[in-house]
Structure formats: structure tokens, C-alpha cells
Design a protein with these regions (language model features):
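A nucleotide- and high-energy phosphate-metabolite-utilizing enzyme signature
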Residues: 2, 7-177
Length: 177
């Protein structure tokens, strides 16, 4: 059977709070103490079970945390530091080697394309609401339409993303994961 991995550290102030907190606490935490990686996680967040309306209300209430009204160039350094930390903690990111290459987190993999896309979103989607969304390919298309990406970069990123996601899905089928 399949198992669901729950990462209990991915919550507001994990070292000092219970696994479940009320939404008022969570909203206050994110508005006052939330970090860039948490903003990135919420870019793709959506309610999938329980009270869907409450989930949508929560996301609406923290939208000013996710989407800053100013061009958030500090997010670029935060993402760069995040990527460096990821690199230190993964043998897949220390060098490019096709033998044992990890298409999800390896250099130039799925995560790199998503980090690239989400970094643009963090920087400019507070003002350009059309750049808000969870679909990486649609956001890349909008980045091209708004002049943030040239045609060649757009095509390269989209082609690579589709190839990597297709490969990932096929590997998951083969490995039953």
C-alpha cells in the first residue's frame, strides 16, 4: 500500500507549537514571522480536504504575506541561500553526474525550474496579479508575455519541465511510488 509522508516541521514555529494550531495563530505567525520558503510553499497551496471554504479563507487572509505589494528583490537572496542550503544537504546537488541523476532535485531538475518560476512570482506577483498561480507552465507563459522571459528561455524551460515531469511520472509508475 501507499503511505503519506507528513512533515510535521512544516508548520508555524514548529519547535514550540503543537502540531495543529488555530488559524488566527497561523495567520499572525505568517504575517509577522513567515519566511521566504514558507511564502514559496503557499504559492502552490490549496485546500484539498476538510472545510474547503475555511481553507480558502485562510489563504485569502495570508495573501498579503505571500504576495508583497512591492517588488521583493530580497526574496532573490533568500532563494539563493535556500538553494545553497539544499546543495549542502544533497549529494545530487554537489555536481552534475548522469549516473544516479535525480530529476526532481538534481542540478537543472524540476525543483530548479520551480524555484526559478517562484522566485519571479515572489518578486513581482504582488503587483502583477496575473503572475499568481500554482501551474508552473502557465506562469512561465505569463512571464514570457510580460517580457520577463525571452522566447528561447521560455521554450527551453517548458520543454525541460514537461520532459522531467513526464519522466518522473513514468518512474513513479515503474517504482509504484
Amino acid at each position: 500500500g501507499s503511505e503519506m509522508c507528513i512533515r510535521d516541521r512544516l508548520r508555524p514555529d514548529p519547535s514550540s507549537t503543537p502540531i495543529v494550531t488555530d488559524t488566527n495563530f497561523a495567520e499572525s505567525y505568517y504575517q509577522n514571522l513567515g519566511r521566504t520558503w514558507e511564502r514559496m510553499a503557499f504559492i502552490k497551496a490549496r485546500p484539498v480536504s476538510g472545510n474547503i471554504l475555511k481553507g480558502k479563507e485562510f489563504l485569502s487572509n495570508i495573501s498579503s504575506f505571500i504576495w508583497r505589494n512591492h517588488f521583493d528583490y530580497a526574496a532573490i537572496d533568500d532563494v539563493k541561500n535556500l538553494r545553497e542550503k539544499m546543495k549542502l544537504n544533497s549529494t545530487h546537488l554537489k555536481s552534475f553526474n548522469l549516473s544516479g541523476y535525480n530529476i526532481k532535485i538534481g542540478i537543472g531538475g524540476i525543483r530548479d525550474i520551480e524555484l526559478f518560476t517562484q522566485t519571479y512570482q515572489l518578486v513581482v506577483a504582488g503587483r502583477q496579479q496575473e503572475l499568481r498561480g500554482a501551474n508552473t507552465i502557465l506562469i512561465l507563459k505569463k512571464l514570457k508575455e510580460f517580457g520577463w522571459l525571452d522566447n528561447r528561455s521560455f521554450e527551453t524551460l517548458v520543454d525541460a519541465y514537461i520532459l522531467l515531469r513526464t519522466t518522473e511520472n513514468r518512474l513513479q509508475i515503474i517504482n509504484n511510488t
